[in-house]
């Protein structure tokens, strides 16, 4: 027992000595302008160190141990660089408040869509909004300057992420500048005089249908048909004039299209909510913004994601959300999206972003809000 304690104490002493060397390495790299992370050099070191072991178990253990030591050493060097004033500016213009005067806002869907409700909640009832057919159209409109802001659903508390909009954040150089959470209460609506027993087909957005699966389990004779928007389903029921059709949308849609609510709040989760993001083509943020969204690609190897997330852990940063999406041109490889608390001026955030930027294949700042 004593021998083990003695060895552990010696390991701690040597580890402290190893970290002291990191300071000198950082000073050298600051002077020469070299990057902290040199993958080729580290791989060579790991191969040389593992060759000192005489069995595979020890080889793996040595690689794991020294990967961690090197990772911690890099984090120390990132911190020292920040302390020396070497900071990567993110080039977001800070403002006291976003400029909504004469702003044109675009949302996907038709009159009565939840996106329209989110828009009016965030920008005000009398905001200058208009609709397009698809989320991609909305992103295109702010890219070309036709609109100043777009309102896009990004995540539902029951059905999960809106994957297409995560992909659009990567495809376009547009930025998240705000968010709005809207309570989602789905109503089943049909033509005036219709009853649930008349209904044979229900239309709605795929996520809305998913969120109301319990209702369909109780009405197995009803066919589900996906359409591009919840409010569009209400418009379709009105336009088709077929008493056997119903739509799932907000009660506001029923009022707009003159439909009758057959049953209210049919979603599985009575606390159902959707988070919408406000997107702009400008790299702008409110001065009090305290949430940052990023995405990054990692090397396709064991432990790569852990090493990226370790930058948040070591710097005491609270992650709020993490999602993954497949990379379209790389089979079985993924891009990761992370929301976390903090500001670009925070030392901890600067350290974490420096580490991820150096060690990831790619990093994109999606916005701060």
Residue ranges of predicted features:
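Domain-level signature for soluble enzymes in the chorismate/prephenate branch of the shikimate pathway
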Residues: 3-369
């Amino acid at each position: 027992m004593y021998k083990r304690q003695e060895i552990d104490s010696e390991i701690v002493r040597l580890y402290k000595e190893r970290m002291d060397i990191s300071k000198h390495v950082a000073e050298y790299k600051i002077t020469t302008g070299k990057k902290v992370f040199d993958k080729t050099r580290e791989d060579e070191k790991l191969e040389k160190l593992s060759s000192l072991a005489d069995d595979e178990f020890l080889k793996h253990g040595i690689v794991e141990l020294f990967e961690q030591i090197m990772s911690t050493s890099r984090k120390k060097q990132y911190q020292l660089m920040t302390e020396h004033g070497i900071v990567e500016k993110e080039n977001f213009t800070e403002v006291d408040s976003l400029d909504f005067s004469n702003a044109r806002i675009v949302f996907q869907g038709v009159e009565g869509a939840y996106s329209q409700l989110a828009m009016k909640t965030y920008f005000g009832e009398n905001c200058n909004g208009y609709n397009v057919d698809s989320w991609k159209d909305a992103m295109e409109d702010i890219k070309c300057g036709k609109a100043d802001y777009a309102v896009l659903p990004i995540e539902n508390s029951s059905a999960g992420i809106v994957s297409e909009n995560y992909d659009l954040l990567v495809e376009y150089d547009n930025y998240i500048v705000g968010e709005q959470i809207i309570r989602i209460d789905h109503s089943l609506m049909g033509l005036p005089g219709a009853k649930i027993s008349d209904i044979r087909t229900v239309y709605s957005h795929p996520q809305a249908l998913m969120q109301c699966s319990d209702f369909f389990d109780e009405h197995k004779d009803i066919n589900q048909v996906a359409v591009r928007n919840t409010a569009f389903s209400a418009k379709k029921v009105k336009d088709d004039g077929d008493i056997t059709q119903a739509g799932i949308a907000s009660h506001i849609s029923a009022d707009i299209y003159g439909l009758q609510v057959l049953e209210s709040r049919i979603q599985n989760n009575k606390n159902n909510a959707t988070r919408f993001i406000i997107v702009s083509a400008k790299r702008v943020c409110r001065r009090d913004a305290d949430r940052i969204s990023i995405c990054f690609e990692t090397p396709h190897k064991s432990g790569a994601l852990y090493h990226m997330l370790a930058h948040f852990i070591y710097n005491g940063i609270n992650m709020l959300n993490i999602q993954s999406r497949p990379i379209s041109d790389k089979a079985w490889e993924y891009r990761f999206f992370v929301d976390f608390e903090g500001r670009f001026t925070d030392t901890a955030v600067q350290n974490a972003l420096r580490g991820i930027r150096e060690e990831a294949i790619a990093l994109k700042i999606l916005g701060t809000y």
